[in-house]
Regions:
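Bacterial N-terminal signal peptides that target proteins for export
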Residues: 2-12
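Structural motif
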Residues: 59-67, 113-118, 146-149, 245, ...
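Bacterial N-terminal signal peptides
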Residues: 12-20
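Extracellular "leader-to-stem" segments immediately downstream of a signal peptide or signal-anchor
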Residues: 32-39, 86, 149, 159, ...
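Right-handed parallel beta-helix
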Residues: 264, 295-306, 328-340, 355-372, ...
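Sec-dependent signal peptide cleavage junction
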Residues: 19-39
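Structural detector of coil-to-beta-strand junctions
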Residues: 240, 278, 287-290, 310-322, ...
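Solvent-exposed alpha-helical segments and adjacent loops
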Residues: 35-200, 657
Length: 874
């Protein structure tokens, strides 16, 4: 279903309206004898005593009502105070319970009754109200604001503030107005966002629309309502909690549980300053992070604003988003604006830097941070750091509503005190398009807890107007990193190395430096011939369904069998294939749509076909990195032991233009790989997904234990494959004779995922033990696993690819051309790139130990052109 979200008028705007309205004067009296008699003027209530004190007390129910009604009453109290020009504490507030009052005493009081209060006037007003009906009326010395449900009570309070506190003369002795609110929605919904998104947005929970205790006007505290929505989503197995456009006041830490994403409607701040979904961090001291992320959770599409922050003497109000946990699968942060955070996004910060993390995706994080914009330590496996941008311009452009400071004051403070991006002890990070302007340090490479920074591929950095563009506190001894096609501009230095940093080598190619690198023991190899590719050619398509219609397979008429997630091997016994295919067919006949599989297990005993304009989609809004159990898991049983796995029917075939697969995990329960020393015992399957049409895509999916992952046929022109995780026995991606395609953000493709299957899912078949068989399985992959094979394709673009173990990471054959940026293999058995027939142009290409220790980074009889090639630990 599609929903357009109504924006709640902020109370501050209502006060402005009030000031205008109070100053109005009556029109001139009519002079003609023929004019009808004027309607008698009904007197307005006097809300104050003669001494100026507030006459009315706001009363809410003690027992009948939850925080929704309580917060509605608080909003009315605060709104009345603002309308009268007094502090909120000057308006008394009470519950309807007290010991033994007389009826005469209660009747004599001047009260504003919010919700189902135990007063006769309130009870009489409630009579006959339907679930969506509300009533605002005056009965004697009582102002009644009530409704047939808590959602209706909230709507009544909003209407009272908007229509009556903005013009107190309208609160008359005969006031009586009824209204109707929208009924709370239920179930999963496709969201019609105000601002464009990369994907179709599917929400499992929409807190405001579903009646949770959240307030998009920013008046009431939304902390509890958001937390409850997140917890409810986690209990469903994970998914997306979507906050529609508005301002949500938060006063303490909100924890985002495992496999849950808190998502908003995000306007890119480079395109405007409406911002969409704004988290108003109403804190005056460091209460911890506003959002605390759990393993495999996410934050996406949110803007953070701190109303009590200032630019002259910034206050440490903690992190906007933080991850503290110890575990191999960290969280993901995408599409975030920081208007004026002290600290923006922090992963494993002190004192939690002893906790290792890996497999995070960090993309489109922008804003103004007064101390640190983004910081991460102790990353044990590669993460992708893409499209970050920090500058004073973001807060300055926010305007008066967001307390934009004096330009000179803010710029001076940032230039003297703040750091845009801190990268600590990271292994082989994949870094693309990080920008900083106007900071003391643009990029700070910090010493770490477990390692030091090494093996980085850094491309298209743009650091300008900083004191020091890049400061290197420590780099791992004798290892290498590469920087290409970047601008590093600092008044005191482009790249400055601490004297304590160990000896290492950094390749710098086709970069603009304001100063020569200086200090420390690092050797810089600089090549500015200008021959490398000038920039990465980014994908410009729209990988999403062509229609907003949503087909939820577990609902009627499909009633697809789904087994709730568990780790005892209970996958259910009913085949989900027919019901899912029926939904796919219906979506195709309707011209497109999203076929949604809520979190759980789905047995696939047959084959699925995805028609044109249709997206087959699981729960979530972020990439998959299952350190824990959650999300949508397809159990692949069909296609065991085919005659030719490379050409056998895939479990899922995308046959229509513009169709795709997103947010799914794949598990082959009958493929335990019990004895990795005998590959003939591997249970063979064909490809999991085949793309057999143009403009098709696979994004944000996880492969637990396939023999083969994704096959792109010659029909798959302009395919887009991005943010995959997991492992594979032979080939994860095969591309055959297309005109053009993109493969991006694959990192830490790692054999340990296969071995974790028994512990995570509770298999009933023998399974490798992660502690005993890791070396043997790595040996198998180093011999047989070529991760990406490109054959006969005119141009394939690769960005930010990392494989752990495996054979050749990228194979180029049959005259294909591959242009790759940031390609890395760790402990591979063979080369990072093997070009047998074709052309590779590579920017930042590396491999570490593995094989015989002397295997080249690139090999083959084809043409190989590489800028910044480095072999670590030969």
């Amino acid at each position: 279903m599609m929903f357009k979200y109504r924006r709640i008028l902020a109370l501050c705007l209502l006060v402005c309206t009030l000031l205008c309205a109070v100053g109005c004067t009556p029109a001139d009296e009519p002079t003609s004898d023929d004019e009808p008699e004027a309607t008698p003027v009904v007197p307005a209530l006097s809300l104050t005593e003669e001494d100026g004190s507030v006459r009315y007390i706001v009363v809410r129910p003690e027992l009948k009502g939850t925080d929704v009604t309580k917060n509605a009453a608080v909003a009315v109290r605060n709104g009345l105070a603002q309308a009268l020009g007094v502090e909120s504490k000057m308006v008394s507030m009470a519950t309807d319970w007290e010991k033994d009052p007389t009826s005469a005493e209660v009747a004599a009081r001047y009260e504003i009754l919010v919700g189902e209060v135990n007063r006769p006037e309130s009870q009489a007003a409630m009579a006959g109200l339907g679930e969506t009906d509300y009533l605002i009326c005056v009965e004697g010395n009582k102002i009644i604001i009530t409704g047939g449900s808590e959602t209706a009570v909230r709507a009544a309070a909003e209407a009272f503030m908007k229509d009556y506190l903005s013009d107190l003369s309208r609160i008359t002795t005969n006031l009586r107005v009824t209204g109707e609110c929208e009924a709370p929605i239920e179930g999963t919904h496709w969201v019609k966002t105000v601002y464009p998104t990369e994907d179709s947005v599917v929400a499992d929970i929409m807190p405001f629309e579903m009646g949770y205790d959240v307030d998009p006007s920013g008046v009431s505290d939304s902390t509890g309502g958001i937390q409850k929505a997140l917890n409810d989503c986690a209990a469903m197995g994970g998914g997306t909690v979507f906050l529609s456009v508005g301002q949500y006041r938060v006063t303490k830490t909100i924890v985002v549980p495992t496999f849950v994403t808190l998502r908003g409607d995000w306007q890119d701040p480079d395109l405007g300053n409406e911002y969409g979904t704004v988290i108003v961090a109403d804190v005056t001291k460091n209460v911890g992070a506003i959002l605390s992320l759990s393993t495999s959770s996410g934050a996406r599409g949110l803007t953070f604003y701190y109303p009590h922050q200032n630019a002259e003497n910034p206050v440490d109000l903690g992190w906007a988003i933080e991850y503290r946990r110890d575990g191999s699968q960290c969280a993901n942060v995408m599409d975030i604006t920081l208007l004026n955070a002290y600290n923006g996004v922090g992963f494993c910060q002190a004192p939690y830097q002893i906790n290792a993390n890996s497999n995070g995706w960090f993309r489109n994080i922008k804003g103004t941070a007064l101390n640190i914009g983004f910081s991460i330590y102790n990353n044990a496996g590669a993460c992708s750091y893409e499209l970050m941008k920090f500058s004073p311009s973001y807060w300055l452009a926010a305007g008066e509503e967001y307390n934009a400071p004096d330009k000179a004051t803010l710029e001076k403070y940032l230039r003297e005190n703040a750091t845009a991006i801190v990268l600590g002890d990271l292994e082989m990070p994949l870094i693309y398009k990080l920008e900083a302007d106007g900071y003391k340090y643009g990029l700070y490479i910090a010493d770490g807890q477990r390692w030091k920074f090494w093996g980085a591929g850094m491309a298209e950095l743009n650091i300008t107007n900083c004191e020091i563009a890049m400061y290197i506190e420590a780099h791992y001894v004798k290892r290498m990193s590469g920087i290409i096609r970047s601008t590093l501009e600092g008044s005191e230095g482009s790249i400055v190395v601490a004297d304590t940093s160990p000896a290492a080598t950094i390749l710098v190619t086709d970069c603009e430096l304001s100063h020569e690198p200086e200090g420390g023991s690092i050797t810089f190899v600089i090549n500015n011939d200008g021959d490398s590719e000038k920039s990465y050619v980014e994908y410009t398509g729209t990988p999403r369904a062509t229609s907003g219609k949503l087909y939820v397979v577990t609902e009627a008429p499909y009633n697809c069998p789904m087994q709730p997630l568990n780790n005892n091997g209970n996958f259910g016994s009913k085949d989900a294939t027919p019901a899912i295919q029926k939904a796919l067919d219906d979506a195709g006949k309707a011209g497109g749509g999203v076929v949604y599989l809520p979190a759980g297990y789905y047995r696939i005993e047959g084959y699925l076909t995805v028609p044109a304009g249709v997206e087959l989609r699981g729960a979530g809004s972020i990439p998959m990195a299952p350190g824990n159990l959650g999300g949508t898991i397809l159990l692949i049983y069909a296609g065991e032991d085919p005659e030719d796995p490379a050409t056998a029917q895939a479990a899922i075939t995308v046959t229509g233009d513009g169709a795709g697969v997103r947010y799914l995990q794949f598990l082959h329960p009958n493929n335990p790989f019990e004895n990795p020393n005998k590959p003939e015992q591997l249970v063979m399957y064909g490809y999991t997904i085949r793309l057999d049409a143009k403009n098709t895509y696979v994004m944000d999916c996880f492969f637990n234990n396939p023999c083969y992952g994704i096959d792109v046929t010659s029909k798959g022109d302009d395919h887009y494959i991005k943010r995959l995780g997991g492992t594979v026995a032979y080939t994860l991606i095969h591309v055959d004779a297309c005109k053009r395609g993109w493969i991006e953000s694959l990192h830490d493709i790692n054999p340990t995922y296969w071995m974790q299957g028994n512990a995570r899912y509770g298999m009933d078949v023998p399974w490798m033990d992660v502690n005993e068989d890791v070396g043997a399985f790595m040996g198998f992959q180093q011999k047989y696993c070529d991760l990406i094979v490109i054959e006969g394709t005119d141009t394939e673009y690769l960005l930010d690819i990392l494989q752990f173990a495996g054979g050749n990471m990228v194979v180029v054959d049959d005259g294909a051309t591959v242009i790759g940026w940031n390609l890395s293999v760790d402990q591979g058995g063979q080369s990072c790139v093997a070009v047998y027939d074709g052309l590779l142009i590579g920017m930042n290409v590396q491999r570490t130990i593995g094989g015989d220790g002397g295997t080249p980074v690139c090999k083959g009889s084809g043409e190989i052109i590489v800028y910044n090639e480095f072999h670590l630990l030969k």
